Amino acid sequence: MTTTGPAALLARLTSPGAPAFAVLHRRTPRLAPDTVEVLLGTVGSHDTLADLPVRTGLPADGPRHDLLALVPYRQIRERGFEAHDDATPLQALAVEEQYAFPLADLLAALPQQPVRLEGGGFDIDDEEYAGIVRRVIEDEIGNGEGANFVIRRDFRARLDGFTTGTALTLLRRLLEQERGAYWTFLVHTGDRVLVGASPEVHVRQSGGTVVMNPISGTYRYPAGGSDLDSLLAFLHDPKELEELTMVVDEELKMMCTVGDLGGQVLGPRLKEMAHLAHTEYELRGRTSLDVREVLKETMFAATVTGSPVQNATRVIKRYEHGGRGYYSGALALIGRGASGGQQLDSPICIRTADVDPATGELVVRVGATLVRHSDPYSEVAETHAKAAGVLAAIGARPGPARSGGTVDGGGGAAGGGARRLADDHRVQAALDARRAGLAP
């Protein structure tokens, strides 16, 4: 890591001829809290995950990042599964420079420019999406094609006068407004911009340990903010319990493949964010596999496809009329530890705005998890809630309501001292009761 200050670096990134770059705020055990990393380099495209140029050997100056890969959903065809081919490229930023700053210092340097939004709306309206939900429940789940499926819809708009400064402004807003995100990030490849706040680990690997983090079940905060009664009702809702149980079961299958040396299940836990909360588990295993093989065998999480995953890809292809781009794919930060061992940190690419920097055209893709007990209009509301964080950042939705029952929890820049609802003993008891349903 070098010592260039954040203001000078951001001035460089907003100048003509700036290199491709990424700004990452990651919640990972290997990184000091409230650290933001900035990576600069060159971008290349690759056909398969095996083609990613993963480096080996001892790094010269201690642990370092070598590569940031953008893995599109269409890459799931490497596993023999179906997907619309929308030609979204598997790209990788080869890291040539890397910097780390305290979050507060970076926020002080990030721009606060006006964001001008033109148009804006879902490509599939609420009634049409509710109709799709009904058909999937009746024709797919009802006929035994699978236990749950995630069907997306797209919010599309245009950011007038879009520049790199606009992208950095959106990142600033997400850092300030969102909480509980695993990664809050901006990636600018030159011809594509991704800016988002993903709550969910796709897969993490270090020192032979591999971690997955299935998240499912969505508690949408009431208009006045979260409260204990509505949270407990959510935790005791059979539909929400069913969602989480099914995706954990599916991702345990993946863990049995990549965690070839054994593993364990931790949780469930509550993940509180700005507009909603989720229930989650953590799966841990020991692996002997290369990071590229781990990425391949975990394409893609049941939480963003469905279960069984292979059947889910067929249902997705039937009900979604085009490709998913990077939605439900992954970002993958690959590097080496001080001893030369492989390191991987990969979030699922959700809650993300995908922007064409040449035109300002923007798409935010979101989906709801459909199970046999799903209510179509509740699933419509779930897509609105999942999009809310990014849409608030671009000015298409109001910012989050704050509640005395939750605290920032370290996700957003503005901290707080209030007690989290997850710390209440009744919430913990409800979460513990869910674990009783897992096989020992």
Describe every region a protein language model picked out:
Residues 33, 153-242, 335-363:
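An anion-binding catalytic pocket shared by soluble metabolic enzymes
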